[in-house]
A protein has these predicted regions:
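SF2 helicase catalytic motif II
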Residues: 1-10
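Amphipathic coiled-coil/heptad-repeat helices and related helical stalk/stem segments
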Residues: 3, 74-75, 126, 146
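Interdomain hinge/linker at the junction between the two RecA-like core domains of SF2 helicases
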Residues: 9, 13, 17, 23-83
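C-terminal helicase lobe and adjacent C-terminal extensions/tails of nucleic-acid helicase motors
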Residues: 11, 76-85, 91, 96, ...
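Loop/turn-to-beta-strand initiation segments
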Residues: 13-19, 87, 140-143
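A short beta-strand-to-loop transition that corresponds to the Sensor-1 phosphate-sensing loop
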Residues: 21-26, 92-95, 146-149, 165
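Conserved helicase ATPase core of P-loop NTP-dependent helicases/translocases
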Residues: 119-147
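SF2 helicase motor core recognition
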Residues: 142-158, 173-181
């Protein structure tokens, strides 16, 4: 709610036009009630669809068939299914799942791993490699295991995509990597569950998957009205639309707590510690850092070679003696063995 209220303020007070562009448009207008009687979402008035005949366009762009299987599978079972196909992308919910499936794929042809356990420079290089391999007919087998990082803003096209169960918006984003350029009459996106290994943890991911499971069985997932219904299902189960209690800090004109609100607000909840890894010329930059100290241009360059880990995993790496604090609050992975050229940062003790 506070984010939408900020956009409404820009619109009403400053005359700003806000353009929402996504293949999985959330419901941002009207009044929606949550499970708590006091939890109401007050949306933006007068949102106008700028694409004419939206429903006809969605029909025209149907290039993918969805195959849904909600029965719990193991890593081995999913890896075996993925290995049936030569050009295939499999997207999972966590970095751990990506590593487990990657390790189980057969070592034939090209197999690649994409997750935030790779530093940004490594991710960019791998995405460029994927694009080149998909165009190169001399490499008939290209299998990629990835996390959600490929679901938005990454222009890759596979004839077959696998997507672990999640919210409808994520599934349709994954389907957008399938038969993207219409080379085939129809592509196939398989939706699968890893519940035989573990249940989806409680939280936003669980809520999103439950909202999808509560859609009518005969729903057409590509129909824009189904996406609207999905978001209603998601919102109506919420206890609050203001998780960080921004209303308490910013909505009382007699007591505006901007500093506290700034500290508490996070667009994306993230308790990660950043570690500089040994990739490319990162260690040369670290030596410059030791010699010259912290400068903005240098830190901007080093940001391309960092991996974020949760505090518990950070403590684990410290206990292995794998991390050095080169300057206050700046950490470097000194053990080269802890960063794999295929799967990135390893949290195991080598």
């Amino acid at each position: 709610q506070p984010i939408v209220d900020a956009l409404k303020a820009y619109q009403k007070i400053f005359g700003v036009s806000v353009l929402f562009t996504t293949a999985s448009q959330p419901v941002l207008s009207g009044l929606i009630e949550g499970t708590n009687p006091k939890a109401n979402f007050q949306g933006i008035d007068h949102i106008t669809e700028i694409i004419p005949n939206e429903f006809a366009l969605h029909d025209k762009l149907r290039r993918v068939k969805l195959v849904i299987d909600n029965t719990g599978k193991t890593y081995d079972e999913i890896a075996a299914k993925v290995a049936i196909y030569n050009k295939v992308l499999c997207i999972v919910n966590t970095r751990k799942d990506a590593k487990e499936l990657y390790d189980r794929l057969p070592n034939e042809g090209i197999k690649l791993h994409l997750s935030r356990m790779l530093c940004p420079a490594h991710i960019s290089e791998t995405i460029r490699k994927v694009k080149a391999l998909l165009k190169d007919k001399s490499h008939p087998i290209v299998r990629v295991i990835a996390t959600q990082l490929v679901e938005a803003g990454v222009d890759i096209d596979f004839p077959v995509v696998f997507r672990q169960e999640s919210g409808l918006d994520s599934i349709l984003q994954a389907a957008g990597r399938c038969n993207r350029e219409g080379r085939n009459t129809v592509g196939t996106t398989f939706v699968f569950s890893l519940a035989a290994e573990k249940r989806i943890p409680f939280g936003a991911m669980k809520a999103a998957n439950n909202a999808r499971l509560n859609l009518p069985a005969n729903s057409d997932w590509f129909d824009p009205s189904t996406m609207t219904e999905y978001f209603y299902q998601l919102y109506c189960r919420k206890n609050t639309f203001d998780d960080k209690d921004m209303k308490h800090y910013l909505y009382n004109p007699n007591e505006l707590c901007f500093e506290t609100a700034s500290k508490k607000f996070r667009l994306i909840d993230d308790d990660c510690m950043n570690i500089i890894v040994n990739w490319g010329n990162s260690m040369e930059l670290v030596e410059k850092l030791k010699e010259s100290g912290c400068t903005y241009p240098l830190m901007k360059q080093l940001a391309k070679f960092t991996v974020g880990v949760h505090s518990s995993d950070f403590d684990k790496l410290v206990s292995y003696g794998a991390i050095e604090e080169v300057l206050e609050g700046i950490y470097v992975l000194t053990d080269r063995v802890q960063y794999d050229k295929n799967t990135g940062l390893s949290l195991d003790n080598h």
